[in-house]
Design a protein with these regions (language model features):
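Hydrophobic alpha-helical segments, chiefly the membrane-spanning helices
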Residues: 1-341
Length: 341
């Protein structure tokens, strides 16, 4: 798909510079649409399957929905490596994690306040903070600012262990509560068969694959046309685009008052962006930072994550915190554009 788009654009660009720009923008719009719809389908139907199996809400948010909403970042990173646009990857991972907390949670808090008390365990909070700091430190203290094969293996190994650990805990809880949920599971299965959900999950994966090719193709060539680093495009346009499934999911969850699932989705999504997406990218890479001052992005991510983890310790969040988070996102984006643009 990526090669077909490249050949088509080369033919059009020879005839008209405007047509070249138009097709790049159109490719990004199509890519964002497919990624958003694919992420929505994957999130909705994978969470349905988990609920039908009796998995608790917070665990669904930390695992199933988090993996589903991180799928656009994963597919985009793989497409970026295939399309030799590795500069998009680090910007996308860091930018998406910043957007998940400051932009998405900020917008959600403008809709409805959230009480974080008891929503996320201290273990999950500590894991998120330590993984974020470790990821940024490894990149910062590496002279070449490279996400290497060894780092990729370590990240992938960690996220695999984390997934096994939290799944084991969920299965133990389900077994202890299965007698109370038996009748509910029948109702869920009859209203929306698991086989149909599994089929939609497959279709969503196809949409994510095609959408990621379109988005990476448009972003890479647009960065080249504008003369800005690919990583900067990844930090902003790609990060917001691939975070749209998280935004749609979060708005839906806050309206249903599923705060534990919402916060679990943000925590889990950030964990999987670093562990799964970063791990796979490092294994398939290596991935090099292409910005002159990448430490700005690392520092922004660590500070924003630390603030989020502090707030998860039982604070009630409302519009004031929402406005503050949005201001932080604008400040972080402005700094990276000024220093790295």
């Amino acid at each position: 798909m990526y090669q077909i788009l490249t050949n088509l654009t080369e033919q059009i660009s020879n005839a008209s510079g405007f047509a070249h720009l138009a097709i790049l923008i159109l490719a990004m719009i199509i890519g964002l649409f497919l990624l958003t719809k694919g992420g929505d389908w994957l999130s909705d139907h994978s969470s349905h399957m988990a609920e039908a199996l009796g998995v608790p809400n917070v665990v669904i948010g930390l695992t199933i929905i988090s993996i589903a909403t991180s799928a656009p970042e994963l597919f985009t990173s793989i497409a970026a490596i295939r399309g030799q646009a590795e500069g998009l990857i680090l910007g996308n991972i860091i930018g998406s994690n910043i957007a998940n907390i400051s932009l998405i949670l900020g917008l959600v808090l403008l809709i409805k306040p959230i009480d974080t008390k008891g929503a996320i365990s201290n273990n999950q909070i500590l894991i998120l903070l330590l993984l974020t700091i470790s990821f940024c430190c490894v990149l910062f203290f590496n002279p070449t600012q490279t996400l290497s094969f060894g780092t990729g293996i370590a990240l992938f190994g960690f996220i695999s262990f984390y997934l096994c650990w939290i799944t084991t805990r969920a299965l133990k809880k389900r077994n202890s509560d299965v007698s109370d949920q038996g009748s509910d599971l029948k109702d869920v299965e009859s209203s929306n068969p698991l086989t149909f959900s599994a089929f939609v999950v497959f279709l969503s994966a196809v949409a994510l694959w095609i959408g990621s090719d379109f988005l990476v193709f448009g972003a890479k060539n647009l960065a080249s046309l504008a003369g800005v680093p690919e990583e900067l495009i990844g930090f902003t346009i790609l990060a917001i685009g691939t975070s749209l499934p998280e935004l749609a999911t979060s708005i839906s969850l806050v309206r249903k008052a599923k705060n534990d699932m919402l916060l679990g989705n943000i925590v889990g999504s950030n964990l999987f962006n670093i562990g799964l997406v970063g791990g796979v990218a490092g294994i398939l890479g290596p991935v090099n930072s292409q910005t002159p001052h990448p430490w700005i992005d690392y520092l922004s991510l660590v500070l924003i994550t630390a603030l989020f983890c502090y707030w998860l310790k039982g604070r009630k969040l409302d519009k004031k915190e929402g406005m503050f988070l949005l201001a932080i996102y604008l400040a972080a984006s402005s700094c990276t554009w000024i220093w790295n643009g």
